[in-house]
């Protein structure tokens, strides 16, 4: 998709604040600092539209980015960051669960994992949770440029094995630095929004 118009239209914490346009939505989920903002910036051809932060846990709301008056990217608060209080984490968890399980315009979820490491317990829990709700899923392994080519197959196998990855879901290696995977991610998004369901 050629992207010219992007707008952060809403930072929401409750369903009453969600956009009401009816455009299809793609949720972007992953632990703090996995690269969600960088993925959004690459997809929309901007350097710093979605705020990237060196402080994990910075995103505390559901941020709705309207893309080309056709769909929304919904940046979900990063999970699994220890310095946030337990009460805060529970509040985020409830907000995320409400959105991911009851939003009728949600067409799929992109779960981001760090390609350099095995998925965390939080990553595994998010993947299993979305599978339980039968949500179309794309796992994006970020920072893939950090993995030497000769070791990539082994690393991909480790990620998939840890997640208990299912064949009907999709998996894409992505690098914000080299733009590897950008077109493939867009194809998946379009298939589940403007070009599909």
UniProtKB/Swiss-Prot annotation:
Species of origin reads Lactiplantibacillus plantarum (strain ATCC BAA-793 / NCIMB 8826 / WCFS1)
Enumerate the residues binding GTP.
30-37, 57-61, 75-78, 142-145, 174-176
* Ligand binding (Mg(2+)): 37, 59
Q: Which cofactor does it need?
A: Mg(2+)
Q: What positions does the domain EngB-type G occupy?
A: 22-195
Please name the gene that encodes this protein. Answer: engB
UniProt GO cellular component terms: cytosol
Q: Which CDD domains match?
A: YihA_EngB
Question: Sorted alphabetically, which keywords does the UniProt record give?
Answer: Cell cycle, Cell division, GTP-binding, Magnesium, Metal-binding, Nucleotide-binding, Septation
Coiled-coil region(s): none
Q: What is this protein called?
A: Probable GTP-binding protein EngB
Task: State the source organism's domain of life.
Answer: Bacteria
| GO molecular function terms noted in the UniProt entry | GTP binding; metal ion binding
The cross-references to PANTHER family, in alphabetical order and at most eight, read: ENGB-TYPE G DOMAIN-CONTAINING PROTEIN, MSS1/TRME-RELATED GTP-BINDING PROTEIN
Q: Which family does it belong to?
A: Belongs to the TRAFAC class TrmE-Era-EngA-EngB-Septin-like GTPase superfamily. EngB GTPase family.
């Amino acid at each position: 998709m050629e992207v010219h118009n992007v707008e952060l239209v809403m930072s929401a914490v409750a369903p009453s604040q969600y956009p009401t346009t009816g455009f299809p939505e793609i949720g972007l989920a992953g632990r703090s600092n996995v690269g969600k903002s960088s993925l959004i910036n690459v997809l929309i051809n901007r350097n710093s539209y979605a705020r990237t932060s060196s402080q994990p846990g910075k995103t505390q709301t559901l941020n709705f980015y309207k893309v080309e008056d056709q769909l929304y990217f919904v940046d979900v608060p990063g999970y699994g960051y220890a310095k946030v209080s337990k009460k805060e984490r529970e509040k985020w968890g409830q907000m995320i669960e409400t959105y991911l399980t009851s939003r009728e315009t949600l067409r799929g979820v992109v779960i981001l994992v760090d390609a350099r490491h095995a998925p965390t317990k939080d990553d595994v829990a998010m993947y299993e949770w979305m599978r339980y709700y039968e949500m179309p899923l794309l796992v994006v392994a970020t920072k893939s440029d950090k993995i030497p080519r000769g070791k990539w197959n082994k690393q991909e196998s480790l990620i998939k094995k840890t997640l208990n990855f299912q064949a009907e879901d999709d998996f894409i290696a992505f690098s914000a630095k080299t733009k590897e995977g950008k077109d493939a991610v867009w194809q998946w998004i379009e298939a589940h929004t403007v070009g599909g369901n």
